[in-house]
Amino acid sequence: KILCSDPFDFIDTYIARYRSPSFKRFGSYNGGLSGYFAYDLVNYTGHLRQFIHQDTLHPLMVLHHIDDFICYDNKYNTYYIATCIYTHDGSIESAYNQAIQCLHTYEDTIINTLSSTSLPYLPAYSESIDLDFTSSPDEFMEKVSQAKTLIEDGEALQVVLSMRALINEPVDPYRFYLKLRQVNPSPYMFYMKHGDLTVTGSSPEIHVKVQDTIATLRPIAGTIAQGKTKIQNKKNKEILLANEKERAEHLMLVDLARNDLSIIAKPGSVQVTQFMQPEDYSHVIHLVSNVTATLNDRISLSDVLRHTFPAGTVTGAPKVRAIEIIDQLEPHPRGIYAGCVGYIGFNNTMDTCITIRTAVFSPQGSFLQAGAGIVYDSIPENEFNEIVHKLKALSVSLPF
């Protein structure tokens, strides 16, 4: 447990103690700090005029020092085992020999585990459970109306309001995660256990990624339900692309991503490499863009995180005022929801996703949460229905 006045400064200080090479067959990861960053860490970014309400039930940040790890290559069905060798203390030869012994031990463990363990059977289909929201639909729609009034008054262009659904039934988090992999596969699948707290999810969206000094943001904004047939799905994509509200919302968040990166990028290096493309997910279709930039030489990985946190797609724009309005209108601090999950590597890489499509399991209360972007012409009922669509893939996994 680390106590410090600035969590982002702590990350810099800690990471500076270690350096490791990169091995492409492992992807970008080669050991580092891995965990979650709660939304309420925005209080420490320096962006806000005053602190927002902060979750007191769960840590603001949980990071694990990962120096032994296993990589699985899906394409070639191959496992790689890695361990870090520390050369700052004692004999390098001795450290190397200990590392080899460690690798052999892990190899034996993997072989024994694969030969003696099978995944539990999970039915192919299940009915979603009723969602126990902490606010009623009418209460949420009233908050949407209040946000619209503030937007009409010029306070903001967009505000992302979320709803929380409690998990009141006993659920095995690991079985939930396995089912989630089946029904809602996403670019980022994660299962993290820290004491009696488990955070697991299937996030579709990068928060920020850094590799070879290139930072990437990938705004996802604009949503429509999946069609039941290929023809209907194609039609839904056309409807989404023709929806002026969804296009305006998406463009606003692409501009916000460009602005976030411009603060930490070399002049002229910010580029939109993909713009407003419809992408299929298990239950919805999203509009997706890709924004990249070359980092300024003086920028550290925690600087990148600090200046992009939290993501504009979970706040709205302008970001600071949207965060203040969210704090005013939502009934409880967001906590883990809408922060990010991922790693900061010893090889100067970082890969994080936004903590959405995520379940939090803990004795203090287990929940799901999702949001919708509110703009001047939002229809409150439609925004509520969007949240229900986003949570559907999670809720069908809950009976497990």
Language model features with spans:
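Extended alpha-helical targeting/anchoring segments
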Residues: 1-400
